[in-house]
């Protein structure tokens, strides 16, 4: 399977080959809100020349001691729910903007999802089963929308590294219901340890690499700061 390298920032830039033509994808993350959207929300995105948008249905773990994932509840904002995702995506599709569905897990009090590692087998199973329900719900939504890309997870290093067999199985289950392109959004210091890149179509990196310790670095200093990271990625 051909693997493409993909960097996720607020602005997502993706290149891929199609019919021998190299097409550049200019993508942005569209933050969910309380309400439905219409042209007045979409037009600013179009003015950035974006032709892809990442839509982010959220889920929550309210107590990491009981790591059950909750999603699509009446406590969420509309844009964070499945119905909100469907409405947002259809509005963007009306103006020929393509869709990546990028589910996000949020831990109460802002804990880092990469550190999520249950301490008992019972809690691991609780996490796995609830994540399965969550990601398959949005894999089915991706199929319903004919979305071009589905991100199967975002910055979940502890989960991924401690339960590799689970992730191999869940990727297979996702592929049974969704036939589009798959990626995973690895944190910048995690990407070279992810064991399942070969099962996906894109290598996703949340590329917040440290580039400079200066308060006001020059463009050249930024470029120099990128060089070692670029070398590691390539």
Regions found by a protein language model. Give the residues of each.
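Aromatic-lined carbohydrate-recognition surfaces of secreted/lumenal glycan-active proteins
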Residues: 100-105, 151-155, 159-160, 168-192
């Amino acid at each position: 399977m051909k693997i493409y390298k993909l960097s996720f920032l607020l602005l997502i830039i993706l290149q891929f080959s199609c019919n021998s033509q190299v097409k550049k994808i200019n993508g942005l993350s569209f933050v969910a809100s309380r309400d439905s959207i219409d042209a007045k929300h979409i037009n600013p995105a179009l003015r950035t020349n974006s032709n892809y948008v990442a839509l982010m249905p959220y889920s929550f773990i309210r107590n990491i001691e009981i790591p059950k994932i909750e999603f699509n509840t009446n406590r969420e904002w509309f844009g964070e729910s499945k119905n909100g995702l469907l409405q947002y995506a259809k509005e963007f599709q009306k103006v020929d903007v393509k869709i990546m569905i990028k589910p996000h897990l949020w831990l109460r009090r802002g804990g880092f999802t990469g550190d999520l590692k249950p301490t008992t087998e019972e809690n691991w199973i609780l996490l796995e089963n609830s994540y399965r329900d969550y990601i398959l719900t949005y894999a089915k939504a991706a199929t319903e929308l004919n979305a071009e890309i589905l991100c199967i997870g975002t910055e979940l290093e502890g989960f991924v590294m401690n339960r590799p067999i689970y992730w191999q199985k869940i990727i297979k289950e996702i592929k049974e219901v969704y036939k589009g392109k798959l990626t995973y959004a690895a944190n910048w210091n995690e990407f070279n340890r992810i064991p399942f890149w070969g099962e996906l179509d894109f290598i996703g990196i949340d590329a917040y690499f440290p580039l400079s310790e200066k308060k006001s670095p020059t463009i050249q200093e930024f470029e120099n700061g990128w060089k070692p990271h670029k070398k590691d990625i390539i």
